[in-house]
Each structure stands twice: as structure tokens, then as C-alpha cells.
Amino acid sequence: MSKSTRRKEAGGAVPGSRVTRRELLMGAAAYAVLPPFAFSTPSAAQFFDADALEKIADRDPEAAAAFIVDAQTHVWWREGGLRTLTPSGEHFLKTLAGTRASVIGKPVPIADMGRMMFIEDMFLHSETDIAFLNSFGMRGAFDGVDLFPPREAAFIRSMAPSRIRVLGVVDPPDGQSAVDSLIYQCEELKIDGLKLYPPGPVTTGWRMDDEKTTYPLYEVLRKHGVKNVCVHKGLPGLFLEEYCHTADLARAAADFPDLNFIAFHCSFPFEAELAEHAQKAKVKNIYAEMGGLAPYMFRTPERYAQMLATVLNGLGADHVLWGTDTPVAGPPHWQILAFQAYGFPAQLVESKGYPVITPAVKRQILGGNAARLYNINVADASRAIDKDLLYKLRVDGNPLPLEVDPSKWTAG
């Protein structure tokens, strides 16, 4: 039976049942496409399109993902491990591992969340084309050394230069030391952007619009042609909530109009503040990034929809970037498929003014916007990826042995 015929028949009722064939097909496709926990909240189903789910489940070429750029990925276990941990550092890592375990359904040792997990998650188990690997500081919680230093991120980039970009990191209260470190990262490590984190329990508070603390960092970026300043906003949990709000972004964006300020996690649950501050300041260089929010698509679907509608309406579809926060939420494959099938139901579009998420909008979010901000030529990047070993391994089904059988060894 052709796909067109199957779609035509899908709307009819199943004999002896009130369930339509469309509903049955959607259920089967949903189970094939979405993660197991997607079905824990029945109201989530209204946000997924039956035709899109069916096409994805059938591997229809029409449903193939666009060029995908993941703006937020991590390695949480640096090479050589950690010598000591403060209680806050230990809590931080256990929270990350516990979150991944809740998604994939099995325990995750913290030490497994290293470079190999990153490579496998991003490039062997997902459709991601380019991943931005985020450095991470918080030295006070991790034996006086960055949890994931920029130099290690740059080294991992060298393993797959066509697939990986690097975001550097500094701690703004470090003053001149932070400036010197950023100069080194720009000149020697060739970072593609800067990632900043709000203070935690063992660090000093700072603001994005502090002329003494952060503005010198922006001047370094400007001098070296690095245009993108990323910052963790929202999701306070492990950070001091006062600094996870967004009131400090608008002035910085206005004072540095040639830089882009990207609020990670869409500043959730403070996304309305983000949109309001950008609109009041009349700045066009504030963006939102979606990392770490995909599980809310199913666990609190109405709240996720409100968040996404707020940033799309408030900032514009051309100001929202795809990100997954991998590895915390597991391999990004399920997030990509879910977003491809996602949309706002008609009643929310009509009653609340939620925007229609067209295929063109999804292409913008999944990769087009990041490609524009980071000056990635999609055609050139695609040609390079086609020749990439990781891409070939994924297309070939990753035909590498998972285990070595010593009985097959032969003496040389």
C-alpha cells in the first residue's frame, strides 16, 4: 500500500470501535518515535502532529531533519578525573548523572560522562551536524581547576574539526586574570564564542552589564572578532537564583550592539522577563537557546508550550537556537525527532495567539539561526561532514565491534 493510500484511509473508524485509524496510526508512530516517558502525561499528545510522526516512523525522506546545529553540549568528566570535590561540586555532578539516568532508564556513573559519551551521543546516535562543546568553570567546587577547561574542549574539537565548535569560559570576578585567559583562548585556542555561568554557592556574584567586571571581556571578544556571548540564564537549581534572571542583559546588549547575547535554556522559567527586557530596550541582539528543556515537552506540556510561544512571539523565530544540553538529557536523537513532530494545537493558536510552527521555522531553529550567528556556510559544512569518518560510521550503522573477542586474536 502506498503512503498516500495509507494516509487517505487513516481517518476512518476501526470496525467495532470508536477509535479512528488515524488515532491508531498516531499511537503506533508515537511509540516508535518518542521516548518512553513521553506517555506519562496524556495531555502532551495534542502537541504532536500525526502526519509528522508517521513520516518520521516510516523514515520518509520528507521528514529528514534539516541542518542541525546544537548550541549546547557538554563533557562532564574531564581527562584525568577529579582529585577532590566540595559538597556542592559532588551534588552538582550527581544531579547531572541522575537527570540522565531518569531519561535513559538506567544508572549513569559520573565518570562515564566524558569525551567518548559526547562523541557517541552527538555523532553516532543522533542526526546532529555541528555541536558547540561548552567549557565549564566553577573551579571552587572542583579542586581549583575548571571542571571542563577550554583547552580540553579545543583538543576534542581537533578529533572532529568539521563537527565540533568550542565555547570558552572565564569567571568574570577574576578580573585581569579572566581577561588574560580570554585573550589566550581567543588567540591560541581559537574559541568560537564565550560561555558564562552565574555564580554558585562558592563563587562571587557578577552581572552581565557590569562595566568593571564583564565589559572588559566583551572588548576582548570584539577585538578578536568573536561575536557571541552565551550565558546560563534560568534553571537556577545549582546556581544562585538572583543571577539567573535576565534584567542584566538589555543594557549589555545595547552597549555592545555588534555582539550577540544568547540566553541559554530560554531563561526558563523566566522567559517572559527575557522577552520583555529585549522589547523594552528595543535591542535585536538578544537570543534564546533551548537546551535542557525538551523533557518539559512531555512532563509539563502546557508550560513548555507557553515558554516556547513566549520566546517565539517575544524575540522572533529568527532569534531562537536549538540546543539539547547533552549528555544530561541523554542522546539528542529523541529530542530532535520530538521537535520535528511538535506544534501548537489550533485552539491555542486561536485563543492564546501562539504562533504556527511551520517547517521553515523549525529549520531556522534547528540550525539556520546558529549558522547565521556563527558564520557557518551550510553548503560548505555539509560537504565537509559528508567526508567525515563519524558521519560514515553512523550512516553505515556504526559497524564497530562493541566487544573484543580474545579467541579471535592471532599471533603476529
Segments (PLM) and residue ranges:
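Mid-to-C-terminal alpha-helical segments outside catalytic/metal-binding sites
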Residues: 2-7, 14-39, 43-67, 80-122, ...
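Catalytic pocket-lining loop regions of alpha/beta-barrel enzymes
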Residues: 47, 56, 192-193, 200, ...
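Active-site gating/metal-coordination segments in enzymes
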Residues: 50-52, 130, 135-244, 287
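Divalent metal-dependent hydrolysis catalytic cores, especially in the metallo-beta-lactamase
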Residues: 90-113, 120-142, 163-169, 192-193
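Histidine-centered divalent metal-coordination motifs
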Residues: 72-78, 232, 265
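Short aromatic-enriched loop/helix-cap "lid" or pocket-rim segments at secondary-structure transitions
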Residues: 79-84, 144-145, 179-181, 206-208, ...
